Amino acid sequence: MTKPIAKISLRKNARIGSNKNERRIPKGVIHVQASFNNTIVTVTDVRGRVVSWASAGTSGFRGTRKGTPYAAQAAAFNAIRTLVDQGMQRAEVMIKGPGLGRDAALRAIRRNGILLSFVRDVTPMPHNGCRPPKKRRV
């Protein structure tokens, strides 16, 4: 009977999260995606690997409260809280979407003591692309 060959990880890009607490990240990129229904804050390192993330839903808000500025502020605080302990000092901020949580999330990021290199609006704007949906009649 032949011996089974031990399988080494089949994933091309293995996860980095095994030594999360040991990694020091001095500079990162904070992505804020603010829709009308929710706000998602993702923190990556300079290479684009996700370090931490939070949303209004994971911060304990449900239903229509997820779209509020206060929920966006709580999501930004939860996403950045662990990174300040890991030593993040500088960050770039990319804001996407038309939601109410844009400014509130940015204010929460500024209050956490991280120096911002720049704040960039990366909301996708069509150059007269697809036809928009018809106007609602209420």
Swiss-Prot record:
Recorded superkingdom: Eukaryota
GO biological process, one term: translation
A cellular component annotation (GO) from this entry: chloroplast
SUPFAM superfamilies according to UniProt: Translational machinery components (SSF53137)
Pfam family, one: Ribosomal_S11
Chief location category: plastid
Location(s), subcellular: Plastid, Chloroplast
Keywords annotated in UniProt: Chloroplast, Plastid, Ribonucleoprotein, Ribosomal protein, RNA-binding, rRNA-binding
InterPro entries in alphabetical order: Ribosomal_uS11 (IPR001971), Ribosomal_uS11_bac-type (IPR019981), Ribosomal_uS11_sf (IPR036967)
Gene Ontology MF terms: rRNA binding; structural constituent of ribosome
Family statement drawn from the similarity comment of this UniProt entry: Belongs to the universal ribosomal protein uS11 family.
Complex formation: Part of the 30S ribosomal subunit.
Protein name according to UniProt: Small ribosomal subunit protein uS11c
